[in-house]
Amino acid sequence: MTAQAGHEQQLIARVMLESPLPQLDRLFDYAVPAALREQARPGVRVKVPLRSAGRIARGYIVETTEAVEFSGTLSELDEVTSSVPVLTPEVWNLARRVSERAAGSASDVVRLAVPPRQVRVEKAWQLEQQSGEQPSRYSANPSVTGYGDRVIDSAIDAGRRLAVAAIPAVHEVSPGVWVGRWAVTLAEAAARTLASGRTAIVALPDYRDQQQVVQALSALVPLDLISQLDARQPNADRYRAFLRCLEDAPRVIVGNRSVVYAPAGRLGLIAVWDDADPLHTEPLSPYVSTRDVALIRQEQSGCALLFASHSRSTWLERLVELAYVTPVAPDPAVLPHVVPTADQPGAEAAAHARIPSTAWNTARRALEDGPVLVQVARPGYAPVLACQDCRTPARCRVCEGALRIGGARQTPACDLCGAIAADWHCRHCESTRIRLVTAGTARTAEELGRAFPGTRVIVSDGERPHLTVDAKPALVIATRGAEPVAAGGYRAILLLDGERMLARESLTVAEDCLRWWSNAIALAAPRAPAIIVGVGGALARALVTWSQQRFSAAELPDRRALRFPPMVRLATVTGRAETVEQAICALPDSVDGHESATIDVLGPVDAGDGLVRATIRFDYALGAEVARSLRSSIIRNSTGRTKRQTSKATGTKTSFRPPPVLRVRFDDTEILE
């Protein structure tokens, strides 16, 4: 390596490229020209040349060094596009670990962690930093209440991992502002961390949960110490909040699943609410859940980790069983008043009633005092239709999609292609009569509005979200997850369509329903009844005794015997038959030191479009080896030699055929639905 002018040693920048190509998932060495030497710091955005492609690529400097093994001439950095080190070493190490666990690319994880640059926002932030203005100081000494004598406080201070059972109640954090009691617990834990001079990250499923936590935090800590990172934010607001996270001052960072990648110089706590919510699973490559990222980051940083929920997931219960996570319950215990109609006298006679007399009478009495929540399975008017005579599901004649009715006196239409079924007839019995199998939020609201004339009816679902309702009498019809928080809590809760929810074919259907129902019941006022219709057995007992963790624990032996998650891990491999076969054959048979761990392959099965899908089940001890093997297969497939395509019109070879598809996804439980 030649020395620069002035006898300075050549500075080398190791750069991660922003590229979806798996073969580029490594660090590339570039020489730093003298003009860029002061700006080329680890974490900054750069532009670099790609010799093979003859173009300029974007990337980040991960590290700089003055020693390099390469003996040839290195290409030079083309440009440092920003002097702000947005990719911190901690986040880079996290991205590398996460991508290796899921056989993905580190650049895909960095894309989730670092929002797009906003030049004006960045320049304004830099001017603020130069002004020397300091954020507010937080000098309080808060404690997490409701869990005995500082149990959670000591765990946060010691950096332990907790599975916290949330308190089923609502709480007024400021005059007229009510939130779930769980939000207060997370806010108190974050404030406790902030008071110790460390940063807290709070990861939540969606914007409804974020609003509750921010409201609870606002009553405890200064607003300028709260940063929100959310994909729903305008790009400028999100980038501004991200830059705040780069500052040295500790703060509370609140957001959705990607917030677990937020930069934090002195990280003291990661808190995750409702880890089993599917919104915690990243839909983009490498498809890693908030729970897994939080566990990795806690291991790397040594911070405290707090999982909170009303109903513990089987994934978390497995970690409790292994004593890797410590369970914490409310002290004193809080027991909601849950009434299952399936266990009441005369339940068999009322089994066919969607709303039995017990539920009607409970709602009527409760409406004299305040709002009543009615949870239903589906939005819309009549989301499921069938033949009135033979009960065959009604299907679209164009695409075979399910038919639905969007409103009263509307014509059935396809839920997939939108085709109107004006002259529908049953293909099985030729009947033209349609039966409304289920009632969605709109039809339920219509029926209850007639049953309780003069009562306010509020519909809350994905299309018409309501985050809060006041304490005045009202019927609130909501789908699962869209229930508003009522001032003072609901005076009664009716959980309808329980049998229909449980009829969904899925490995996790029982624990999902338990989670949906538990979250709704937790919105009740003290001693208010929660009526669950048509559900009995172990699920009803878990709700009545408020012992959801026992149900989760009882699931694990069966999952272990059947080799289902979370007792084993899954990976799906999708591609053309020969490509999938090559990837499967390359898997290791065993790993030294873990000879008892096993790998088994299910399939391949047809995945449509000429592709097949194989499912790999493997023990946790084999996870790293399986990920490395599949990652190698992805790279080989991506870099394999391809044949030229010949133009039929001219007979000339015009382009290269792209490599065959090979997609790998770890911990994909959707295939079990």
Briefly describe each language-model feature range.
Residues 17-18, 259, 462-466, 602-607:
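Short, solvent-exposed loop/turn elements at beta->coil junctions and helix N-caps
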Residues 598-614:
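Short Gly/Thr-rich strand-loop-strand
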Residues 63-65, 114, 376-378, 461, ...:
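A general secondary-structure junction signal
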Residues 163-191, 198-230, 236-239, 246, ...:
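Inter-lobe coupling/hinge segments of SF2-like helicase ATPases
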Residues 547-549, 578-602:
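Short amphipathic alpha-helix segments
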Residues 50, 561, 604-607:
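Short proline/glycine-enriched turn/loop segments at secondary-structure junctions
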Residues 1-340, 347-349, 365-368, 390, ...:
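Accessory, non-ATPase domains that flank or precede helicase/AAA+ motor cores in DNA-metabolism machines
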